[in-house]
From Swiss-Prot:
Region (RCL) residue spans: 328-349
Note: Possesses several potential secondary cleavage sites.
A single MF term (Gene Ontology): serine-type endopeptidase inhibitor activity
UniProt GO cellular component terms: extracellular space
Source taxonomy: Eukaryota, Metazoa, Cnidaria, Scyphozoa, Semaeostomeae
Signal peptide: 1-27
Matches recorded under PANTHER family: GH10112P-RELATED (PTHR11461:SF211), SERINE PROTEASE INHIBITOR, SERPIN (PTHR11461)
Domain comment as written in the entry: The reactive center loop (RCL) extends out from the body of the protein and directs binding to the target protease. The protease cleaves the serpin at the reactive site within the RCL, establishing a covalent linkage between the carboxyl group of the serpin reactive site and the serine hydroxyl of the protease. The resulting inactive serpin-protease complex is highly stable.
Name this protein carries in UniProt: Serine protease inhibitor
Site (Reactive bond for chymotrypsin) residue list: 342-343
Keywords noted in UniProt: Glycoprotein, Protease inhibitor, Serine protease inhibitor, Signal
Function: Inhibitor of serine proteases. Inhibits chymotrypsin, cathepsin G and human neutrophil elastase.
Coiled coil, from the record: none
Amino acid sequence: MAALQAAVSSQLAISFFSSLIVPGAEKNVVCSPLSISSALALVAAGSRGKTLKEIADALNWREDADGLAKALLAEAEKAAQNCDASCPVKTANNVWVDNEFKILDSYRDLLKSFAVNVGKADFKKHSSDETIKINSWIEDHTNKKIRDFFPPGELSEATKAVLVNALYFKGKWAEPFDMESTRDDTFHVSNSKEVQVKMMYHSAELKYFMDENSKCDLVELPYSSKAFSMMLIVPHEVEGLSAVQSSLSLSQVSGWISNVQSAAPQTVDVFLPRFKVSQKVNMKDNLKSLGINDMFSMQANLSGIAGSHDLFVSSAIHQAVIEVNEEGTEAAAATGFGVNFMSMPMQVRADKPFLFLIISNVTKSILFIGKIANPAA
């Protein structure tokens, strides 16, 4: 079941990430599939009929649709449990329900079984105050990395319920990059454009794999907790990332993770720019591109929440923030709703657009996935 759960969120990771990519754009991209799937689980738990089927199909869920929400919530819970004090990952789910809106006991009980708090709110009379309160909760649960999540007016007197997931991750490298080795260096945004960046350097015994088909190098950078690691996917050519992105699939990413993690450690010189990326998206169009349409329409069947058919999802927002430096990685997200031995060290230079993953080594789920097109942007 654990492998199935990871496959579901990983499918979402690839599909949603791909929907964020604008061909040819020099844009950094980051999202948290684990946060998105957790928020979707809160909706799926109350969905029925076509609405639920669309969510299940988008996630390639082939089991009983009623078990989807439980699987997604269980995966997030397991990922958070497999982290020690040296690498805290914290995930929290909260549902706020308007005072005059009654949810079904069965929905409330399911949420509580996964430690999802259900609170009251007065959206009808004090939507502005409730927006401030909910934004404050998100800020607190992301170590203040995400502020003012819901913009003014997003929640109104018509709001019946707000479903939110917050995810925070801060990992220290198992072997930190030496601060004194960081240098000003050139990052090739394209064949015709270069920018200056702070390039970190690190030489260590690491797991490395070269994908000859995709023409890229992969290296795993473990965090001190060992339960999580970052994986870099660096193309051989300056403009090679577009080809990698166009063929991105669940089987390919799963193969990358398997090949890298089964490789024998070898000496690898890693050059990695410091970077910080923040991205906020209205997920409606992205989710619709994955085939999730019904829950946003007047035909939505969310009768598992309140027993009625007059509910639909009015907004779906996701924000992710990630910062990588010599010490490690700090990231936050919120969602509303086989190698040959070589005598010389291998060298992985992330001095051109590349992809990164932060993965759970226990559940194999993807916490964050991103693209760095220009670290100086």
